[in-house]
Amino acid sequence: MRPIRLAVAFGLAALITLGCVPGPLSTTWIEPGTPPTPYRDLIVFGISTNPIVRRAYEDNFVEALKGAGVQARAAHTLLSDRDVGRSRAVQEAVGRSGADGVIVTYLAGENPDAAPSGGRTHVVPSLYGRLYPYYGHILSEVTAAGYYANYRALRLEANLYDAGRAKLVWSGRSDTLDPSSEQTMISEVIAAMIGKLKADGFLPTS
């Protein structure tokens, strides 16, 4: 599958001007008090205002997961564009799939002059804790008109939920990305996310 450049995939170059910070992955969070479990069957939900971009985004993430030896499916193969915004339809699709994990991923807007997080671990809002209602909330927020116009920086965020418990177990954010850079490809950042998930014990190593 052809790699997706940020500028092409998300159409944000005209909206945001920002610098590129070296290094693909910035911060991670792991559920405290619970030993990591390797997830072997995942569903990937990409969040985007454009259905075509969302499907391509999910496909690239799934391809990378399969390349790492993990069974994975794109949400668009289980849900119509209409149903992807309906929480009940999403819950039913996840339940029918038999998947043990769900990844929700999107480009998060950020203002670079905001206070630094102070380390390699980011603070996860309480709303993130449960897949439902988190999914509906983030879908509504990111797809709202003008969402990206309010920010001058982007970070790729990926959140892994245990499908059975519908609970967040791992969250990661990339370093600041430059959507206008021809050198910045979404596949590079996805690969870094998957590598970190594997290193943290949430994906099988073989």
Feature map (PLM): residue ranges:
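N-terminal segment of the mature soluble domain
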Residues: D41, F45-G118
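Surface-exposed short loop/turn segments
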Residues: R86-L160
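Short acidic/polar alpha-helix capping motifs at helix-coil junctions
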Residues: P24-T27, V53-E58, H122
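C-terminal/domain-edge helix-coil "capping" segments
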Residues: C20-R40, T49, H137-S206
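Bacterial N-terminal signal peptides
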Residues: A9-G19
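Bacterial N-terminal signal peptides that target proteins for export
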Residues: M1-F10
